[in-house]
Every structure is written in C-alpha cells, then in structure tokens.
Amino acid sequence: MNIPYGKQTIEEDDIQAVVEVLKSDYLTTGPHVGAFEDKVKNYVGAKYAVAVSNGTAALHAACYAAGIGPGDEVITTPITFAASANCIRYCGGTPVFADVCADTYNINPQDIERKITEKTKAIIPVHFAGQPCDMDAIHEIAKKHNLIVIEDGAHALGAEYKGKKVGTLSDMTTFSFHPVKPVTTGEGGMIVTDNPELYQKLLLFHSHCITRDQSLMKGYEGPWYY
C-alpha cells in the first residue's frame, strides 16, 4: 500500500481563481488576501486576522507580538513540528518542553505547571493532529502566572473545543495552509486574535513595520512610512 504524504483536491474554480490573481495588478498582499483574512476570522469567530507566508511565519509573528525576547522562557511540546520551538528561538527566547498526555499526545497541563519559572513568558500548546488541547486547564495556569497563550492550530482549522472553534480561545492562534493541512494555499499561514494591540503588532511585523498610520510612528523599532 502506498499512502501519500499529502493529496490535494484542486478543481477548475481553484485554477481560475489563481489565473484571476495572475492577471490582476496584485501578485502579493492585495484584495484577495484581505478577503481571505475576512473569511477565516469570520469562520472561527475572531475579530482580527493577519495572513503571512506560512505557518512558521505565523508563529514567529505571534511570538514577536507577545514581546518574547532574550531571557524569556516559553513552554511548548516536543511532539510537534520544529517551528513550534524555533519561533521562540527566532525572538531570542528559550523553548522549555513539557511532556504530553499518553492518550492524546497533547501537552500535559500538569507538566506545564511543573516547568514554570520566574522567566516563563508564554505557553504554546499545539493541537496535535487537530485535536484541541485541554485549554481550560492551560488557561487556568496562564491566568495564575500571568502568561500569554499562543495556540499552534496548524492542523486545527475547524476544530472545536467545548462548542467554540479553535481561534477564539486564547490571546492568539496560528494556522497553517501547507498542503497537508485542512485547507491549503500551497504555502501560507494566518494569526487570529481578539486583541487590538496584538493585531497592530502583527500588522507591523507582517509588513516590515511599514505603515501610513502616523499614530504608530513612534518607538525605537519604527514603524516607517512607505
């Protein structure tokens, strides 16, 4: 038996949609990206969505928006793709691995509690194979220790936790549109959030801090007008 790594369903209307973009004035960013962001945020029930080039970039952007930097520790799972830990390193933080539950392969909240130190800044739970983690327990820990929660929902677009779609539960949630994910754009990623301050930071990160909003043009890191 030959089981494919991934098999996509590409139909004629998909091809025509790509042709439409290729014939338009926008090969990047553009109105189609904005429409896609709107569809995803409306589908999951979030207030804001920011599209990026892939799921790894989504995690990187979320860590940046969360203010993770040198000296910070972020707890995540070792049973995941490397990006779930690499995104922490990209921002100068240190990944700390908590063990998983034997029945779900999702991160174990009890071990999260054991791994918390005075340096812990955030938790990145990964919904293994699209199966949501025990978010109630994770949020209880995060509230107790004043931690940010970034859900890695790469495989979990459409998944629900106690009647709520993944993407509405935590400070930020990231999705991937790689060919082996529930929805694919070839490559692609997205971050959703209900927090307007995090949203502005995500927008700046995704556009190299370029903005035409003068109210945002302050601070050491930029932004800059383009």
Feature names for model-found ranges:
Residues M1-L27, P31:
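N-terminal "arm"/small-domain region of PLP-dependent enzymes with the aminotransferase-like
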Residues Y64-G153, E160:
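PLP-dependent aminotransferase-like
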Residues A156-K162, L169-Y226:
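Active-site region of PLP-dependent enzymes
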